[in-house]
Amino acid sequence: TEQAAPAADDPEGMVKASCASCHGQNLEGGVGPALADVGSRNAMPAGMVDPAK
């Protein structure tokens, strides 16, 4: 069976479903770069995330 995508009002669920596999469970980095405190360093590259989400 398919698992439902996390709701927009569940940011932790969205991170676990969409980001953690590459960026680590605590966003410490892994296959992808560390995202912890990323807001204070850079902006998300254009096209990486659908702005509607």
Curated annotation (Swiss-Prot):
Binds 1 heme c group covalently per subunit. Disulfide bonds: none annotated. The keyword Cell cycle does not apply. It comes from Schinkia azotoformans. InterPro entries: Cyt_c-like_dom, Cyt_c-like_dom_sf. It comes from the Bacteria. Its main location: membrane. This is Cytochrome c-552. Pfam families: Cytochrome_CBB3. Keywords: Cell membrane, Electron transport, Heme, Iron, Membrane, Metal-binding, Transmembrane, Transport.
